[in-house]
């Protein structure tokens, strides 16, 4: 009689939907019943009330927890897209796992099935395979443990140096900071490139687009900027340090390998994270890589530190997103891109920000790269990103092949907020340079048709040629801001107007060597003060005049 009552009590305690019961629940219930039978002799010797209490205690003490796992089955698979039936409660952008071990992300939530993009080779998945929810939105490891490492879009190490030891993880699709935590850009982000720091200055927390045709030096500007941060990161002042994240999207593996080698040779990898989703990787990984890199950069920003992230390039991310959207049968729009391609980039670039002191005072600066076709900046993706960012550096093929490198078009390049962050010393020497160069380009176009030019026009042309020569700079050779100030000072104050344009580069190299070796105190004063005082101006004038006399002799 007791056995029947025990069995009935156990059955009543179990959930009614047996299809959802795990083995753990059944096993633990049967163990409770077996334990009761084992102590049946003991129960017979006790009173009815005591026996009931022991029985109740045994049944209530049994582990009846139910581990529910929602699973579905693959209806169709192809082109990196899986249609899955049965995942009724899956979240948007939730990670799911296939029976082969491959991971995917749910993007399309439809009434009868879920569209899942696969992170890898879909040949490992077959129709009818079981798909399991993980309950986790896609996240990546973050933290200083990633510095010096090369990782994929999911944060897995691909540099052969072992797994990432970071214990902190962040979602890749976090919302951008609101209005209240932000503050206007006020600190300079030195690139070490004369043409950029003087004409299109960038501030910490800014979004500055680098745009141009292929093979015009877009990546070179980004890499030089990373290398230039070594002078700040070698110091102990955490406020001056700038941690760098380079996101390679759709590039060749050999290109990424060369880039990592270049950064290693320059001793810049120790403060850099490289996130790589190469051309051979699945489109979902190329789509995800910028968001993963941004989450890694936000870790530094939200901890009161400063970070720089380079997206090279967002054109390929847009192409990968277009591929995924068309395969998911989303309606195409202009140039076959989906309607939310603007939101694709705006929600990414809005995460770059300068935070106010109440929120740590950190910053995340973004340098997105966009590749144009035959200089067409009015195409869909370039115009979108231009409208989102705080300015652009426009690189021209024509200037590049003329030997003007970096091939920055001064007229089309602009920095909307960076001038507020430019150091006062650079403002003092470069204030009129952009106007002079713009006038020079305009006059140079008309000067081709006539030889009779007045003295003022000839002076403008002469100054423009020399300033253009002065702004040329070799690859992987960034300069300190005080060195740039000294060189540009000589050009804009007219000391080089009588020097042959072909000798400008030679003069610059010799002059820099002289100043660095003989007048380190003056450079230190400019660096510390952030401006050119009357004493510094007089000293600089004397140095340039004396050196030029010896150089021409």
Curated annotation (Swiss-Prot):
Broad class of the protein's primary localization: mitochondrion
Membrane topology per record: Peripheral membrane protein
Disulfide topology: none
Boundaries of the annotated transit peptide in chain numbering: 1-43
GO biological process: lipid metabolic process; negative regulation of endothelial cell proliferation; positive regulation of blood vessel endothelial cell migration; proton motive force-driven ATP synthesis; proton motive force-driven mitochondrial ATP synthesis
Compartmental location: Mitochondrion inner membrane; Cell membrane
PTM annotation (Phosphothreonine): residues: 134
Positions annotated to bind ATP: 215, 217-220, 473, 475
Positions of post-translational Omega-N-methylarginine modification: 204
Site (Required for activity): 413
Classification via InterPro entries: ATP_synth_asu-like_sf, ATP_synth_asu_C, ATP_synth_asu_C_sf, ATP_synth_F1_a_nt-bd_dom, ATP_synth_F1_asu, ATPase_a/bsu_AS, ATPase_F1/V1/A1_a/bsu_N, ATPase_F1/V1/A1_a/bsu_N_sf
N6-succinyllysine found at: 161, 167, 230, 239, 261, 305, 427, 498, 506, 531, 539
Keywords tagged on the record: Acetylation, ATP synthesis, ATP-binding, Cell membrane, CF(1), Glycoprotein, Hydrogen ion transport, Ion transport, Magnesium, Membrane, Metal-binding, Methylation, Mitochondrion, Mitochondrion inner membrane, Nucleotide-binding, Phosphoprotein, Transit peptide, Transport
Molecular function GO labels: ADP binding; angiostatin binding; ATP binding; MHC class I protein binding; proton-transporting ATP synthase activity, rotational mechanism
Changes after translation: Acetylated on lysine residues. BLOC1S1 is required for acetylation.
Ligand binding (Mg(2+)): 219, 312
Phosphoserine modifications at: 53, 65, 76, 106, 166, 184
Residues recorded as bearing N6-acetyllysine in the entry: 123, 126, 132, 161, 167, 230, 239-240, 261, 305, 427, 434, 498, 506, 531, 539, 541
Glycosylation sites: 76
GO cellular component: mitochondrial inner membrane; plasma membrane; proton-transporting ATP synthase complex
Primary role: Subunit alpha, of the mitochondrial membrane ATP synthase complex (F(1)F(0) ATP synthase or Complex V) that produces ATP from ADP in the presence of a proton gradient across the membrane which is generated by electron transport complexes of the respiratory chain. ATP synthase complex consist of a soluble F(1) head domain - the catalytic core - and a membrane F(1) domain - the membrane proton channel. These two domains are linked by a central stalk rotating inside the F(1) region and a stationary peripheral stalk.
Further information: The siderophore enterobactin (Ent) produced by enteric bacteria binds Fe(3+) and helps bacteria scavenge iron ions from the environment. As a consequence, the mammalian siderocalin LCN2 plays an important role in defense against bacterial infections by sequestering iron bound to microbial siderophores. LCN2 can also bind iron bound to endogenous or nutrient-derived iron chelators and plays an important role in cellular iron homeostasis.
Assembly and oligomerization: Homotrimer. Component of the ATP synthase complex composed at least of ATP5F1A/subunit alpha, ATP5F1B/subunit beta, ATP5MC1/subunit c (homooctomer), MT-ATP6/subunit a, MT-ATP8/subunit 8, ATP5ME/subunit e, ATP5MF/subunit f, ATP5MG/subunit g, ATP5MK/subunit k, ATP5MJ/subunit j, ATP5F1C/subunit gamma, ATP5F1D/subunit delta, ATP5F1E/subunit epsilon, ATP5PF/subunit F6, ATP5PB/subunit b, ATP5PD/subunit d, ATP5PO/subunit OSCP.
Name of the protein in its database record: ATP synthase F(1) complex subunit alpha, mitochondrial
Source organism per UniProt: Pongo abelii
């Amino acid at each position: 009689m007791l056995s029947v009552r025990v069995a009935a009590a156990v059955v009543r305690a179990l959930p009614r939907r047996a299809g959802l019961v795990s083995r753990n629940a059944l096993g633990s219930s049967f163990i409770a019943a077996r334990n009761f039978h084992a102590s049946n002799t003991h129960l017979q010797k006790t009173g009815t009330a005591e026996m009931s209490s022991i029985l109740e205690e045994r049944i209530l003490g049994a582990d009846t927890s139910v581990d529910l796992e929602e699973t579905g089955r693959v209806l169709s698979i192809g082109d990196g897209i899986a249609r899955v039936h049965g995942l009724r409660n899956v979240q948007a952008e939730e990670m799911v796992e296939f029976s082969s071990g491959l991971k995917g992300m749910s993007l399309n939530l439809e009434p009868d099935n879920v569209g899942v993009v696969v992170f890898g080779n879909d040949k490992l998945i077959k129709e009818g395979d079981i798909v399991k929810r993980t309950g986790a939105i896609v996240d990546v490891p973050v933290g200083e443990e990633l510095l010096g490492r090369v990782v994929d879009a999911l944060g897995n190490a691909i540099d052969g140096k072992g797994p990432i030891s970071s214990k902190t993880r962040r979602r890749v699709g976090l919302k951008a900071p609101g209005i209240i935590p932000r503050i206007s850009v006020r600190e300079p982000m030195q690139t070490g490139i004369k043409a950029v720091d003087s004409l299109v200055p960038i501030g910490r927390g800014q979004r500055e687009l680098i745009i141009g045709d292929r093979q015009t030096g877009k990546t070179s500007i980004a890499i030089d900027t990373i290398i230039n941060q070594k002078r700040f990161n070698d110091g102990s002042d955490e406020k001056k340090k700038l941690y760098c994240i380079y996101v390679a999207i759709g590039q060749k593996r050999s290109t990424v390998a060369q880039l990592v080698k270049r950064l290693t040779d320059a001793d810049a990898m120790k403060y850099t994270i490289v996130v790589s989703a190469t051309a051979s990787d699945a489109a979902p990984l190329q789509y995800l890589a910028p968001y993963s890199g941004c989450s890694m950069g936000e870790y530094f920003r939200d901890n009161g530190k400063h970070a720089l992230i380079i997206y090279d390039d967002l054109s390929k991310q847009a192409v990968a997103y277009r591929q995924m959207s068309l395969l998911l049968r989303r309606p195409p729009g202009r140039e076959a891109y989906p309607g939310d391609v603007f939101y694709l980039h705006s929600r990414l670039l809005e995460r770059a920000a300068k935070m106010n002191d109440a929120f740590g005072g950190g910053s995340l600066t973004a340098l997105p790269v966009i590749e144009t076709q035959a200089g067409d900046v009015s195409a869909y993706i370039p115009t979108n990103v231009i409208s989102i960012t705080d300015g652009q550096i426009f690189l021209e093929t024509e200037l590049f092949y003329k030997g003007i490198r970096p091939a920055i078009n001064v007229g089309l390049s602009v920095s909307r907020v960076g001038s507020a962050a430019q150091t006062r010393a650079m403002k003092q020497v470069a204030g009129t340079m952009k106007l002079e160069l713009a006038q020079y380009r305009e006059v140079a176009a008309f000067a081709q048709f006539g030889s009779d030019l007045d003295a003022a026009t000839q002076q403008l042309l002469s100054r423009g040629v020399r300033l253009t020569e002065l702004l040329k700079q070799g690859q992987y050779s960034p300069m300190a801001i005080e060195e740039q100030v000294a060189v540009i000072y000589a050009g804009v104050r007219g000391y080089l107007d009588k020097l042959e344009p072909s000798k400008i580069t030679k003069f610059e190299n010799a002059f820099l060597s002289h100043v660095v070796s003989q007048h380190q105190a003056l450079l230190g004063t400019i660096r510390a003060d952030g401006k050119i005082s009357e004493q510094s101006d007089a000293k600089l004038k004397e140095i340039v005049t004396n050196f030029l006399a010896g150089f021409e002799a």
